Every structure is written in structure tokens, then in C-alpha cells.
Amino acid sequence: MSGGVKLIAGLGNPGDQYARTRHNVGAWFLETLAQQRNQSLAKENKFHGFVAKCNDYWLLKPTTFMNESGQAVAALARFYKIKPSEILIAHDELDFPAGDIRLKEGGGHGGHNGLRNIIQHLGSSDFYRLRIGINHPGYKDRVTPYVLSPPSENDRIAILAAIEKGLRLIPELVQGDFQKVMRELHS
């Protein structure tokens, strides 16, 4: 992959009942980024989401449910001719503790239905993922209710700190300095 990020999408489910849930931490990331950049996210039906143009890159918060996120990402990417390698997806990551944040280049969906749908709609897995740790409930049968509930106060504070850490590295992501971002986040 080469070049910098031209599209940043933050995954989550629409609606107030999901806004504070663990599954929406990608949307938390995107909303905070838009606020920091003084951008208003405007609803764009053709992109199935809320969108803002931020200098040389786009912000996207899908209005689809998580497992249909690919509709929004692919619609905006195709319209603006953004390659998968120029896309960053911010999402919740069960396999990391709350407070961890890591950048991953390409790969599979790891059981994440939002990523699975994005791969399907793009026809490629060659995009970047900003994986925001939310902890794991310990048992597979508890995952759905866990991700659809709010984090504990301690976990929420750790998640917000991880988001801030990721937001500080947006300039490097846009410039394509992915190795620097990985060094910063993974050390």
C-alpha cells in the first residue's frame, strides 16, 4: 500500500440507543475528529452516512447498521475514486484491552461484521484499520450483548484516551507515514 489516507470512516450503529455502546467507538473516534477539525458532518443519502471534507481527506460516519457499513464506505470511495489502500476504518476491537489502539494494514475481518461487509463491498481487504480496544466479555455467547452495551466508566476513560492517542496521529496517516504511526501506537 502507498500514499496517504483520503477517507476515514468511523463504524457504529445508528440511533441514540447505540450511541454510547462499545460497538460505536469507531463513530466516537470520527465524531471527535470532526469536532477537533471544526467540521460539521452533513447527512448525504447517496453515501449512506454523515460526511465532511477535511482538507485532503473525507470523514464518513455511516448511517447504516454495522453489518452494512460497506455500502457507505464503497459508495463514497467509488464516487471520489479513492483506492482501498487510501481508506482508514476506525472500529471496535474485542481482542484488545480497553485503552489499546493499533493500526493494521490489510488482512481479514477477524469476525467483525462491519469489516466483513466493507471487504465484500470494496472487493478488497487492502485498507487500513484503526483498532480501538474494548476488551472481551470472556465468552463467545456474551459478545453481542457486550458490544451493544456501554463500557464501564474505567473502560470508557481508557477508550477515550486511546482515541485521543489515535487522533494525534491523523497528520501522519494523511501523509502516509504508516510506519511512524505503528511505532507510536504499538510501543
Swiss-Prot record:
Keywords: Cytoplasm, Hydrolase, RNA-binding, tRNA-binding. InterPro entries: Pept_tRNA_hydro (IPR001328), Pept_tRNA_hydro_CS (IPR018171), Pept_tRNA_hydro_sf (IPR036416). It is an enzyme of class 3 (hydrolase). Its EC number is 3.1.1.29. The record marks N13 as: Discriminates between blocked and unblocked aminoacyl-tRNA. The active site is at H23. Pfam families: Pept_tRNA_hydro. The record marks D92 as: Stabilizes the basic form of H active site to accept a proton. It catalyses: an N-acyl-L-alpha-aminoacyl-tRNA + H2O = an N-acyl-L-amino acid + a tRNA + H(+). Belongs to the PTH family. This is Peptidyl-tRNA hydrolase. It comes from Coxiella burnetii (strain CbuK_Q154) (Coxiella burnetii (strain Q154)). The gene is pth.
